[in-house]
């Protein structure tokens, strides 16, 4: 609908640029050139004696991390173009999709030229990466100049939000580009989240309660825990793209519910990639059916992201079993799970990743009265701002026993490598969770902006409010396409650690921005605990921290780019 006396016909015809796909396609080489020049400049900064130096990357962290963000923008725009071209070929590139695509290019081209926000307090500019204005020579083309001047206009944003209002309650704003089977899966889990999760999520959060076991049982019946486990082991053998869709829609309902399958995904990936035949036959069917629930036990109090320096010890006894001694922290869903994927040091003569081994450590599920009944194991809850529903714990091990047969792969010293093999899937899934949280923020904020009236009209009729909603929708679609691309690569057997890292990096920032802007739209009410957006803000904050903090993620991406 038109707002504030605007004429609908005029707004529709003026908002979308002529020959849009031709314009955006022509802009891609200019961005690619800037990225290539930045990579060359940063590589020169961090090279010593003909080799890229880790110490110099650390010393030039702003430049290196800026390169990671620039590469992420470059890949994001490429995937938006791929998405748009595919929709156009199928006759599905409608007005909403055109506006999403157009605004995305207009905004991201400006940010590449003027500064990319790594977060709300850090903007990285081309000068930080050793480039001058001459690096932007390709940005002087008519196509790029047209997009920068006109693509992200107030008229475009206003028209986009008008279309969003017309489609209020739709599964998403804009076509996903996925096939019909995946959209059927999406619809199934969207309905479930609307019926069983959304009405209860805020109470679970405010009361800091565990997600009811009935929800876990229902999700198990729907196949959530065996989604990507091969059929021969009792799973559904579906794609990582299906995992994205399920994670996205459940996290849209509540991030805690969307994260229930994360540890099962990690455990299954570990066992499929590194387990013995006996371990696969024993554990995978139980994981797929949720007969057992796993938890990931990696992080230690003084190591954080530096997993290679873990100190928890695993000592092999004469009977071939192991005893675990040490401390772990930030262990999600630790109390009521049945098995821990536990990383510990089996070689005391090492101080890096080479002495680490992975165990499938069995435990007895706890109760509220006795959360950790297994001998040799203690734990205490860590109270947290958000990401509730499974609870976080510190764990202590003192002579905790693990059967020798539960050493993953039956070989010591392989634990870190085995864990690394799960990072692609874990980061893709986390990116999907971030999209779900961002979409939740948009859903809540848009409804509030429509319902809340100030100065005689709905908030959504004010350009700065509608502009926030428009940019939420645009960036959600950008993050979505980057995430789906990384899932596609994974499904087709291609290395995708770079793209998965980019998807997680961008998705986390998009989720936080959506939650923050969603709360801003609520004004003072957003600061009240009774309003759902307050929960979403707390939940969104974790996405830039876990599964690789944003700084670590950018560091990893930079190392891959620089070689």
Please state what every model-predicted region is.
Residues 395-417:
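Long, acidic (Asp/Glu-rich), low-complexity accessory segments flanking structured domains
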Residues 302-305, 330-333, 348-350, 383-391:
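Short Gly/Pro-enriched turn/cap motifs at secondary-structure boundaries
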Residues 302-311, 370-376:
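Active-site-adjacent elements of ketosynthase-type condensing enzymes
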Residues 290-298:
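A short, Trp-centered hydrophobic/proline-enriched beta-strand micro-motif
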Residues 367-399:
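Flexible, small-/acidic-enriched active-site or ligand-binding loops
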Residues 321-376:
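A short core secondary-structure module
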Residues 262-268:
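Short, conserved phosphate-binding/catalytic loop or strand-edge motifs used
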Residues 2-253, 257, 262, 274-275, ...:
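Alpha-helical interface subdomain recognition
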